[in-house]
């Protein structure tokens, strides 16, 4: 099983706290954490980050036949990118959205999540663990007949 871990704008600059590890983790550390977790789960990964909407769409469009699932952290594009939503809907590969923080606790305009309508599952506000929870859930979805109901964790 292989997943595309697709990260949107500014994820490459953010920093997170990792449970049990003092200090902060940068993007490279975050992706190392995700990679190690996926390795333990027996999931291959193709990790990509872009600050450009078109590049994210190109990755989504090239997913069929290349990966079995998409784990998407759309960053700010979550709130207005109908183009990414359309790419997800046109793509035959199931996708799960990860939001590292809780947008409802931020500015009012972040309460709308357009991209979520193209995803089968949503993991919101879990920090780095959200990636692994999303991968586990997506793997379970793919191991069933794929007809599982949408899943939201907040």
Where in this protein do the model-derived segments appear?
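Short beta->alpha junction loops
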Residues: 44-54
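Short glycine-rich anion-binding loops that position phosphate/pyrophosphate groups of nucleotides
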Residues: 9-11, 75-78, 101-103
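Short catalytic helix/loop segments, enriched in acidic residues and glycine
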Residues: 20-38
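Short acidic/histidine-rich motifs immediately flanking catalytic phosphotransfer sites
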Residues: 63-70
């Amino acid at each position: 099983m292989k997943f595309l871990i697709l990260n949107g704008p500014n994820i490459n600059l953010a920093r997170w706290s990792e449970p049990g590890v003092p200090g902060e983790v940068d993007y490279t550390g975050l992706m190392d954490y995700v990679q190690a977790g996926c390795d333990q789960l027996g999931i291959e990964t193709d990790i990509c980050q872009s600050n450009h909407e078109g590049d994210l769409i190109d990755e989504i469009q090239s997913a069929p036949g290349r990966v079995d699932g998409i784990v998407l952290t759309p960053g700010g594009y979550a709130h207005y990118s109908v183009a990414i939503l359309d790419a997800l809907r046109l793509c035959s590969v199931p996708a799960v959205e990860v939001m590292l923080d809780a947008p409802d606790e931020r500015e009012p305009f972040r309460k709308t999540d357009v991209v979520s309508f193209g995803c089968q599952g949503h993991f919101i506000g879990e920090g780095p663990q959200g990636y692994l929870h999303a991968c586990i859930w997506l793997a379970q979805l793919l191991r069933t007949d794929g007809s599982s109901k949408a899943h939201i964790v907040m």
